[in-house]
Amino acid sequence: METIRNFSIIAHVDHGKSTISDRLIQICGGLSKREMHSQVLDSMDLEKERGITIKSQSVTIEYKSKCNKIIQMNFIDTPGHVDFSYEVSRSLSACEGALLIIDATQGVEAQTIANCHTALDMNLKVIPILNKIDLPTADPQRVKKEIEDIIGLSTNNIILCSAKTGTGITNLLETITHNIPYPKGNPNDPLQALIIDSWFDCYLGVVSLVRVKNGYLTKKTKIQIMSTKKIYNIEKIGIFTPKPIFKDILKCGEVGWIICGIRNITGAPVGDTITQHPNSAKKVLSGFKKIKPKIYAGLFTIQSNQFSLFRDALGKLSLNDASLFYEPEHSLALGHGFRCGFLGILHMEIVQARLEREYNLQIIATSPTVIYKIIMIDNTNYYLDTPHKLSTLQKIKEIREPIAKCLILLPIKYLGNTLLLCSQRRGVQNDISYYNNQILLDYSIPMSEVVLNFFDQLKSVSSGYASLEYNFELYKVAHVKCLDILVNYKKIDSLSTIVHKTKILNQAKNVVEKMKNLIPRHQFDIIIQAVIGTKVIVRTTIKQLRKNVLAKCYGGDVTRKKKLLKKQKIGKKRMKQIGNITIPQEVFLKILNNN
């Protein structure tokens, strides 16, 4: 165990985590020259297209140190976006150390602070690294001062490197060897292994990534999942280099994958403990806290005959993405679907894109909403994640909305525009700290304002230099209402939204105007209303198509024409009473996508 080092690579988005991973693999011979390519650990098409890491990837490599010791390094490349912070915390739970990568041109950013504090809270050894020192705009001295002032880390032994050119990577490997502690555990104790990640393979069943804390794992060992008490035989064991390599044993302190022929997607939950059977361990390992979704949205298939495939796809995806929550939901307009919980808008977009690409589904998503806390007159609490249900609740004492604690780091010259944006989003300033040319803003902003497009607008007003980190803070009394959309006096539940009183009129006008432009005309008037309770806020009418019943009358008495017009009037009146309004799926798609 003295020759094992387990560590994660953490950083803000685009600071060079994946490129440093490439250099470590290249120098240690994890892949041949023919197999090497840039961002080798970003295996998903979405990761390559967006240039971000979405899923943590584990790699085992061997490094021969300058003192001729062979060191086994198990490292995990983690995502940098705030929406995937749960992936980071899960990865850190399997490690004794963390490499904190900081871009020498951009300096400390909000997610750098958050990731570093997460690692320090878990008592990990954090090694700060300045990357991209080869660029002409790099300013190592300024960034060192930011690290000391903003994060509070010593920079006496900071590593200067360039992942692109390979400068400083050997020095980094030596620092990992000497500074990150080796894992603690007893190979003679009963087996305890933590499930870090799981995914479903069509041929092999559930594949689990595990960290062996005590004991060891061998092929054909009988194991027990401690939460379900179910017993399985280990069929295959291996590691990633990053390509899968089969092994006969996973020793104490090692990270690797196991296949046990589990066909049930809930058979090996992430965060669970694996032990042997018999001679089981008495205690479960402290896993990681189950994260709560920050936003909810309804997901529906455009083709109703795909529902069973959709249900299976969500199950397999949730195994690989433990932060995804879902439960069945029915909409009068969109049919059967699922109410899904996400960590943010990017997380929602990635899940939707993966469902469409990996499972060939056509998905429509309703407007995302946060979770509101409803206090009833009898002081009972009700948590609401579906907007249209608000109008059905009676005896409400007050409605509370979630507030996010936001840390915004930006250059001082963009302060004015950023303060204005935070004010427009109903933000309250808690603190402001100055660090040379950088400012750290501490704001409390309603979560509903943050999760939608706040980050995009923040980047816009700061020319891309501002960075954001946010977390749930508390629930606060809010003056919000449920805005319902009625078409010919029938409520369209999938278009209901919860809106703050100051924004109700604008929101109502926007939705009604879009619907008027998108819904096709019928042979009778269509009335579109935006209402709060029974009060109509905005109303418009899509005028009926006029069928010319007089086209065949070329003369004769005027009473003949009057008779035809009267008959048409009676028919239209009857049609309005019993006629169904056809709202194409494309209309919902355009309205909801715009929202």
UniProtKB/Swiss-Prot annotation:
GO biological process assignments: positive regulation of translation
Keywords, alphabetical: Cell membrane, GTP-binding, Hydrolase, Membrane, Nucleotide-binding, Protein biosynthesis
Entry's Gene Ontology molecular function annotations: GTP binding; GTPase activity; guanosine tetraphosphate binding; ribosome binding; translation elongation factor activity
Annotated Gene Ontology cellular component terms: plasma membrane
Keyword Nucleotide-binding: yes
The protein's enzyme class: hydrolase
Protein name: Elongation factor 4
Organism: Buchnera aphidicola subsp. Baizongia pistaciae (strain Bp)
